Curated annotation (Swiss-Prot):
Protein name: Choline/ethanolaminephosphotransferase 1
Membrane topology: Multi-pass membrane protein
Species annotation: Rattus norvegicus (Rat)
Cofactor requirements of the protein: Mg(2+); Mn(2+)
Gene from which the chain derives: Cept1
Residues with glycosylation annotation: 144
Family: Belongs to the CDP-alcohol phosphatidyltransferase class-I family.
Keyword Transmembrane helix (UniProt): yes
Enzyme class: transferase
GO molecular function, one term: diacylglycerol cholinephosphotransferase activity
Residues where Mg(2+) 2 binds: 133, 154, 158
Chain positions recorded as CDP-choline binding sites: 86, 151
Length: 416
């Protein structure tokens, strides 16, 4: 079964590609399914075939992972066996996003002071996401429901969470008063996540460093709690020896982390891939993925610096979310390319949102840049969701599984 057949089913028929795996769809459900599903399946038959052969490979462990394993094992033991791993992941992501949106609501320019409970909620939301994200794979193995879809879903949620986590951190330390630093921190976060999967696309193995996601998440949780304890005076206070504001300390940590991580990533990338003649796992150039993330960052910098109305300075959260959704989509496409051993194509609807902003500036802001930013934000979010829903549904249909439900017997079982 290639996954192509079920996209032609009539509304009301049994629909194996339904995101939640329900058998019967109402008229409203059918309309939503068409709205959030691409007209043609995103993956070819050859890609689906190679996806079946994919096996998850990882190497290394971070500093806190051995210490957290006991807690994670205890936590997964409390989860009912009928709860699907992907459901655990999406619940954690939803909580993480909702708590960050609270901060965005109260601090749209990342310079305001939010209610103390909003910072506590954001810290708790991130801890919940970190916990649930860590146990989804354990739940998959525990219920014998591991699949390539689970791995893709996990990385896809992480790509979106990264955007909200770095944005929430910038808001917590009120980094909007230093727009250049805020811009750097947010894009450095998404760039590092992309590079992690870039080196996986090259080497075939996802590598974890001594300081990795878990450590960064714990550090960010501490930042939110410090915002509760110290408030604005704490972040505005000066660090004695360095003679800089305290709020720049997380930014300097981001610089150090970016240098450290990217050094390791590019060492793997430039060493050569596992493909023919040192190419990627798909047999393509090891440098080819740079075109995608490079295009996103270049457009983001140009639009930021050329704006006549200080678009980023006045609306940093909307700006970061817009380009964050674009980055999340191309990261997801990179993960799919790795798992299906296929080439990444540069032409993508993800670039339409940034292109609208660029063209509007080129024609001397024929339309208010703020309005175009909202259009780009909505389009980029819709484009991301549409792609993710389509890919997940097609893979679920092909593997004869459900996205958010565990089947009694699982036909395909890989490492999650």
């Amino acid at each position: 079964m290639s996954g192509h057949r079920s996209t032609r089913k009539r509304c009301g028929d049994s629909h194996p590609e339904s995101p939640v795996g329900f058998g019967h769809m109402s008229t409203t459900g059918c309309i939503l399914n068409k709205l959030f599903q691409l007209p043609t399946p995103p993956l070819s038959r050859h890609q689906l075939k190679r996806l079946e052969e994919h096996r998850y490979q990882s190497a290394g462990r971070s500093l806190l992972e051995p210490l957290m394993q006991g807690y994670w094992e205890w936590l997964v033991g409390r989860v009912p066996s009928w709860i699907a791993p992907n459901l655990i992941t999406i619940i954690g992501l939803s909580i993480n996003i909702c708590t960050t949106i609270l901060l965005v609501f109260y601090c749209p320019t990342a310079t305001e002071q939010a209610p103390l409970w909003a910072y506590i909620a954001c810290a708790c939301g991130l801890f919940i996401y970190q916990s649930l994200d860590a146990i989804d794979g354990k739940q998959a193995r525990r219920t014998n429901s591991s699949s390539p879809l689970g791995e893709l879903f996990d990385h896809g949620c992480d790509s979106l969470s990264t955007v909200f986590v770095v944005l929430g951190t910038c808001i917590a330390v009120q980094l909007g008063t230093n727009p250049d630093w805020m811009f750097f921190c947010c894009f450095a976060g998404t760039f590092m996540f992309y590079c992690a999967h870039w080196q996986t696309y090259v080497s075939g193995t996802l590598r974890f460093g001594i300081i990795d996601v878990t450590e960064v998440q714990i550090f960010i949780i501490i930042m939110h709690l410090l915002a509760v304890i110290g408030g604005p005076p704490f972040w505005q206070s000066m660090i004695p020896v360095l003679n800089i504001q305290m709020k720049l300390f997380p930014a300097l940590c981001t610089v150090a982390g970016t240098i450290f991580s990217c050094t390791n990533y590019f060492r793997v990338i430039f060493t050569g891939g596992v493909g023919k003649n040192g190419s990627t796992i798909a047999g393509t150039s090891v440098l080819s993925p740079f075109l995608h993330i490079g295009s996103v960052i270049t457009l983001a910098v140009m639009i930021y610096k050329k704006s006549a109305v200080q678009l980023f300075e006045k609306h940093p959260c909307l700006y970061i979310l817009t380009f964050g959704f674009v980055s999340a989509k191309i990261t997801n496409k990179l993960v799919v390319a790795h798992m299906t051993k296929s080439e990444m194509h540069l032409h993508d609807t993800a670039f339409i949102g940034p292109a609208l902003l660029f063209l509007d500036q080129y024609f001397n802001s024929f339309i208010d840049e703020y309005i175009v930013l909202w259009i780009a934000l909505v389009f980029s979010f819709f484009d991301l969701i549409r792609y993710c829903v389509s890919v997940c549904n097609q893979i679920a249909s092909h593997l004869h599984i459900h996205v958010f439900r565990i089947k009694t017997s699982t036909a395909h079982s890989n490492h999650h």
